[in-house]
Amino acid sequence: MIWHVQNENFILDSTRIFMKAFHLLLFDGSLIFPECILIFGLILLLMIDSTSDQKDIPWLYFISSTSLVMSITALLFRWREEPMISFSGNFQTNNFNEIFQFLILLCSTLCIPLSVEYIECTEMAITEFLLFILTATLGGMFLCGANDLITIFVAPECFSLCSYLLSGYTKKDVRSNEATTKYLLMGGASSSILVHGFSWLYGSSGGEIELQEIVNGLINTQMYNSPGISIALIFITVGIGFKLSPAPSHQWTPDVYEGSPTPVVAFLSVTSKVAASASATRIFDIPFYFSSNEWHLLLEILAILSMILGNLIAITQTSMKRMLAYSSIGQIGYVIIGIIVGDSNGGYASMITYMLFYISMNLGTFACIVSFGLRTGTDNIRDYAGLYTKDPFLALSLALCLLSLGGLPPLAGFFGKLHLFWCGWQAGLYFLVSIGLLTSVLSIYYYLKIIKLLMTGRNQEITPHVRNYRRSPLRSNNSIELSMIVCVIASTIPGISMNPIIAIAQDTLF
């Protein structure tokens, strides 16, 4: 009799949970339509892979790319709609979140054609690779729209787990295994630190998990200036710092960049920073509204360390991927300036604009590295000497992307940095902007050093890798060139395109 009653209660509880989930999906599902497209694409990939043979491989690329493009289209159609909170307060839809989701989708869309030839040459498992890319993209999109502490913790874990698997995708490579181990251990530690900070925030607010409700809870409990909030701020900053990889939370970055497959590095180098930046702006600006002076100071220290250490250590590197790893540490220091400035002086708009240009500059550079690596099998900067004599198109593309990363006019990187530094100067961050300007000049040195090698024509400096280089024709079926051309064009956009981009970015208030 007791078992019968317990069984009936279990069935009733299960039915209530199912009906509640169905109700949420029915009424709130339209607000996550772009994410649903990616989920449908994931299911379709699994179905095709389990029922087809090797001849259907092009369909896997087509489905992945189409899912991403359709998701971008759905986001664009939803632009300028009223902000909405759905799924019982777990998810928020507004222009600010959507523009970061657009950037993540753009990164993934460009990374897939960049990876095709690499996967074919290295004989990597295609379906799993595409599944991890789409799942990581999905996690990043949910992180951008996360509105409570649980979702903010679960969404990046979804992204991180896929990142660990992708970084160790070449299991026979010792460097890849080492990079994955370090990445996994440090990622697990940072997640523990982050959730510990969330627990302090949860307790101080009286048990609230939604971001805006946490602010109300802190006011009601009079805990907004308590030591507990300071402890929460420190732990959360350290946890988010792992995702952004500013100094001194950058130890995993060079090893992961060097040991992971190059298309994976290209994907992680931009998507992780975009998603973490979106999350950081909301966490610091909403729950820590009353501690703005404290988190401004913390981020200023991180920005200064990142800009100085990243650019100084990049000068000494001999590996192209390690050089870009330290360069990315310096670049995130510039992005942090926009986060500190905030919405009052156009900081978020300048950060979003620079992030858009950074995506094109960085992915364009990695597209060139993938192409060169497949034809020579080397990643050493010295082995790029004389590339212009063998493949002028590739050499010029790499040179333009590097010059744009350095911020030389009239390339896109110059105008992105100019607007970012100008907003910081207007906000009174004179010392921070001065450090940014000096380190930008410093970064030009090691970028120009590589460009000088590319353009050299002296036979004694050209290594056997370039002498035996198999040139890829300009008009070929090579999908890497598609991503490369798009990124190079976007990296060289003149300043005339800045105004409409900034106007769109300024329309992202939350």
From Swiss-Prot:
Q: Where in the cell is it found?
A: Plastid, Chloroplast thylakoid membrane
Nucleotide-binding in keyword set = no
MF terms (GO), sorted A to Z: NADH dehydrogenase (ubiquinone) activity; quinone binding
Q: State the annotated membrane topology for this chain.
A: Multi-pass membrane protein
Q: Does the keyword Protease apply?
A: no
Q: Which Pfam families match?
A: Ndh2_N (PF19530), Proton_antipo_M (PF00361)
Q: What is its main location?
A: plastid
- List keywords of the entry alphabetically: Chloroplast, Membrane, NAD, NADP, Plastid, Plastoquinone, Quinone, Thylakoid, Translocase, Transmembrane, Transmembrane helix, Transport
InterPro entries named among the record's database cross-references: NADH-Q_OxRdtase_suN/2, ND/Mrp_TM, Ndh2_N
TM ranges: 24-44, 57-77, 99-119, 124-144, 149-169, 183-203, 227-247, 295-315, 323-343, 354-374, 395-415, 418-438, 484-504
GO cellular component term, pick one: chloroplast thylakoid membrane
Swiss-Prot/TrEMBL catalytic activity: a plastoquinone + NADH + (n+1) H(+)(in) = a plastoquinol + NAD(+) + n H(+)(out); a plastoquinone + NADPH + (n+1) H(+)(in) = a plastoquinol + NADP(+) + n H(+)(out)
Q: Origin, by domain of life? A: Eukaryota
Report the EC code(s) recorded for this entry. Answer: 7.1.1.-
Instruction: Name the family the entry cites.
Output: Belongs to the complex I subunit 2 family.
Q: What does this protein do?
A: NDH shuttles electrons from NAD(P)H:plastoquinone, via FMN and iron-sulfur (Fe-S) centers, to quinones in the photosynthetic chain and possibly in a chloroplast respiratory chain. The immediate electron acceptor for the enzyme in this species is believed to be plastoquinone. Couples the redox reaction to proton translocation, and thus conserves the redox energy in a proton gradient.
Outline the subunit composition. NDH is composed of at least 16 different subunits, 5 of which are encoded in the nucleus.
Instruction: Enumerate the HAMAP family for this protein.
Output: NDH1_NuoN_1
Name-wise, this protein is NAD(P)H-quinone oxidoreductase subunit 2 A, chloroplastic
Lineage runs: Eukaryota, Viridiplantae, Streptophyta, Embryophyta, Tracheophyta
Task: List the gene name.
Answer: ndhB1
